[in-house]
Amino acid sequence: MAREPQRIKRRERKNITSGIAHVNASFNNTMVTITDAQGNAISWSSAGMMGFKGSRKSTPYAAQVAADDAGKKAAEHGVRTLEVEVKGPGSGRESALRALQAVGFTITAIRDVTPIPHNGVRPSKRRRV
């Protein structure tokens, strides 16, 4: 009657040499996703995932730690060269890029893909701090 223990499947190593790093830097958090050329995610990380809470998530250091984590996971799958796509107005844009270089990737292109409206919806009211 006793159930046999379930085997945990190990994630297979993808053998990919080049990829695209999508850095989404918002005002509240920074998310780094490394994909292959088709857009299938290889690894991802964020400042919140790395244990930063509240306003500390939006710091450049939190973005650096998140990019470092995502980069190390992608390097295990054999990624060597990256194109970087940066999106958003956050403070973690440059530090995430530097962290990816520090991991040891050769960065071939840096693109800013922040969506800019051609006068879209009305913005929210101004903050009074």
Swiss-Prot record:
One of its GO terms (cellular component) is ribonucleoprotein complex. GO terms for biological process: translation. This is Small ribosomal subunit protein uS11. PANTHER family: 40S RIBOSOMAL PROTEIN S14/30S RIBOSOMAL PROTEIN S11 (PTHR11759). It comes from Novosphingobium aromaticivorans (strain ATCC 700278 / DSM 12444 / CCUG 56034 / CIP 105152 / NBRC 16084 / F199). SUPFAM superfamilies: Translational machinery components (SSF53137). The keyword RNA-binding applies. It comes from the Bacteria. InterPro entries: Ribosomal_uS11 (IPR001971), Ribosomal_uS11_bac-type (IPR019981), Ribosomal_uS11_CS (IPR018102), Ribosomal_uS11_sf (IPR036967). Located on the platform of the 30S subunit, it bridges several disparate RNA helices of the 16S rRNA. Forms part of the Shine-Dalgarno cleft in the 70S ribosome. Keywords: Ribonucleoprotein, Ribosomal protein, RNA-binding, rRNA-binding. Part of the 30S ribosomal subunit. Interacts with proteins S7 and S18. Binds to IF-3. PROSITE patterns: RIBOSOMAL_S11. One of its GO terms (molecular function) is rRNA binding. Belongs to the universal ribosomal protein uS11 family. HAMAP family: Ribosomal_uS11.
